[in-house]
Amino acid sequence: MSNQVNDISYVSLIQVNIVLNKNIILWLGSATPRALRDIDLAQDSVVKIFSFSREPNVVQPWQTTEKEYSSSGFAISGRRILTNAHVVGDHSYLQVRKHGSPTKYKAEVKAFGIFGARRYTFIGETIYALGYPRDGDIISVTKGIVTRVEPQKYAHSSIEILTIQTDACINGGKSGGPVVMGNKVAGVVFENDSPSDK
C-alpha cells in the first residue's frame, strides 16, 4: 500500500470542512530528525472519520441498510480536514472525532482537490504512517522506509499518480491519515488496486 500533519489548534469542530485529496500526494518539504517530538505533534491533528451510506437490498429494493465505515484524516489550516476521496465520497452522512475526545461532530465535504508534488521523497528515507486502524480507537503509528517511488493507479478513480511505497505496516482504516517525514507531511495513506502491494 502506498502512503502519505500540519500544526492545528482545535477551536471547535462543529462545522468541519472536509477537503478531499484525489491525487493523494501532498509534498510539503524536507524532513528533519526530530521524529518523536514531531510524531507527538502530528497525532494531535489526526481525526477518525465515520462515513455512513445506505445500501440497497437486492431482494427487496425498497429497503435499504445503513452501513458505517471508519477511516482517518488530519486537520489542516482553516478548520479543514484532509483525507482521501474514497474515505468520504459517495456517503450520505459524515462524522469526525478528534484525537483524545469521545465526541463526534457532523462534517460535510466542501471541496475536491488534486495536489501535485513539491518535493520528491527518495528510496531509503524514513516515514511514519498515522491513522486509526479499522475498529480501533487508538491512533496507530508505524515506522518504515520508502521502498519505491512510481506512478500507480488510485483505486477510487483509476487516475495515475506518483506514489511512494513503504515497508511500514498499513492497516485498513488508516487510509486518509498522514504519512510524516520529520515535521512535514510526505503524503496521505491510500488504497491500492494491487493486492501484492498491501
Swiss-Prot record:
Pfam families attached to this UniProt entry: Trypsin_2 (PF13365)
Region (Serine protease): 48-198
Coiled coil residues, start to end: none
Active site: H86 (charge relay system), S175 (charge relay system)
Signal sequence, renumbered to the chain: none
Family listed: Belongs to the peptidase S1B family.
Protein name, entry field: Putative Do-like 15 protein
Species per Swiss-Prot/TrEMBL record: Arabidopsis thaliana (Mouse-ear cress)
